[in-house]
């Protein structure tokens, strides 16, 4: 009982202001993708190109998110998490304003790539600082609660983006993103602690390569990092492709498109709330196992229904909603186990995880796009199911050792 009260106090006093400031920046970068995706139909019209460029915007954004992961984590280990994170918030604001100067889809896509680099700061720097600051059960609760706030972006983003382009030019969205990032900068400047453990060490590229080689040789880490990527791929593929699937493919309105996102991301939030409630009461491996059933089952429902009837978009939404609940329940624990499967400094480990995940997302979204172009909704959801089955196989291998995630920390 005393331990639980102590955890509650720590969660309330130590883990409030900094995570809220970080999640505001995270929200700005996420809504920078989720809100603009429905607006991409207006963007391609502005530049006079076809709709195949719609998911490419998200591909470029996520590719940027992979670009500097390898460097930012180790740099923050040595010069400090705080200055690197503050630089990231300012960088995102500048690139959001710079995109207003583009005059072709190629320039727009390049700026989306540069904006995407801002994602590198979240996992490799911000989340690493949080993981270093708190014990396991408290950290998982913080991560789950932060995820709920961050998930407002994909929940409200499609609705807000669809409404925005009916009322205002799409360019105004990027001014909003820049303003949110600047507000996050002010909060982080005041509240972010310093948790780096290797400050003052010289950054050597050969030593950096050696560090990454040690991390990647760890089979448990590699399996967990791949699993984290495949877990979220169906959700990100849906975010990227759903404007085309719903509005162009099914002929529905932008309002209908936005409303179909609500059950999916609402269930994702519910999964995170369930995780926050169960964390500390159940071993981490048990939480992952509980999430596996709805994850794979939901993807199977979406695939079978759309292979049987190509326009069964309501069944597809129901299946993806069930999957989203599962990922909300399982993913934070899997992330934690993977991060601490290596003894290397957490900036380096987190950066390696981020690069692997972003590579899977970048490649997977393009594969998902072509699956839909070639085979419609059925092929798209079959691709998502394959991703879920790969996740299941990797997690089964990772949890084969009964000692992994088998303790309950309060």
Curated annotation (Swiss-Prot):
This is Multidrug transporter MdfA. It comes from Edwardsiella piscicida. Residues 1-15, 74-84, 131-144, 188-226, 277-286, 335-346, 400-410 are cytoplasmic. GO terms for biological process: response to antibiotic; xenobiotic detoxification by transmembrane export across the plasma membrane. Keywords: Antibiotic resistance, Cell inner membrane, Cell membrane, Membrane, Transmembrane, Transmembrane helix, Transport. Pfam families: MFS_1 (PF07690). Belongs to the major facilitator superfamily. MdfA family. InterPro entries: MFS, MFS_dom, MFS_trans_sf, Sugar_transporter_CS. Residues 37-52, 106-109, 166, 248-255, 308-313, 368-378 are periplasmic. Efflux pump driven by the proton motive force. Confers resistance to a broad spectrum of chemically unrelated drugs. Monomer. The keyword Zinc does not apply. It is a multi-pass membrane protein. One of its GO terms (molecular function) is sodium:proton antiporter activity. The keyword Ligase does not apply. One of its GO terms (cellular component) is plasma membrane. It is found in: Cell inner membrane.
